[in-house]
């Protein structure tokens, strides 16, 4: 899977596979991601401005910002693809089962960080309280709090679970 920007080099890469006698993969070229305002393609050169707003396009930053991997996958899958017009919450297993290349939208899609917050909240509420407690522990430790009482952390997680977005 490579964005449509790679279409001009597709014949070259196809010939390389042919020359080496390798089996051709299924080549998929979805549309590019646009900046949140919909004006121009999203670029790593836009990273500094995004970080000032508390956002990022780099996977390594999402974890530090409190986003669950499940939420990031759900969000990213729905940029330029949809299963139907009703379903938006997907586990990884759901996506493996339901994803189809035929439902990719060829039009460029703007990155919507509010949707990422929304999906993160949905996935946080889908966790067990014990799982959430373990996932928030590092954030408390990083903030300088010593967590010596697992039951208290569990109680805090239970209260926070309905309010957290990220």
Language model features with spans:
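Conserved nucleotide- and phosphate/pyrophosphate-binding catalytic cores
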Residues: 5-11, 15-166
């Amino acid at each position: 899977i490579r964005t449509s920007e790679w279409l001009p080099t597709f014949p070259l890469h196809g010939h390389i596979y042919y020359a080496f006698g390798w089996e051709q993969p299924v080549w998929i070229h979805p549309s590019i991601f646009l900046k949140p305002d919909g004006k121009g393609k999203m670029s790593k050169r836009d990273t500094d401005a995004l970080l000032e707003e508390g956002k990022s396009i780099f996977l390594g930053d999402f974890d530090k910002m409190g986003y669950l991997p499940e939420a990031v996958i759900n969000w990213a899958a729905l940029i330029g693809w949809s299963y139907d017009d009703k379903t938006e919450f997907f586990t990884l297993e759901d996506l493996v089962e339901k994803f189809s290349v035929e439902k990719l939208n060829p039009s460029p899609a703007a990155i919507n960080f509010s949707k990422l917050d929304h999906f993160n909240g949905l996935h946080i509420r889908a966790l067990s309280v014990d799982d959430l407690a373990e996932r928030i522990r590092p954030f408390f430790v990083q903030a300088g709090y010593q967590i010596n009482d697992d039951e208290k952390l569990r109680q805090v997680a239970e209260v926070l679970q309905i309010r957290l977005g990220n």
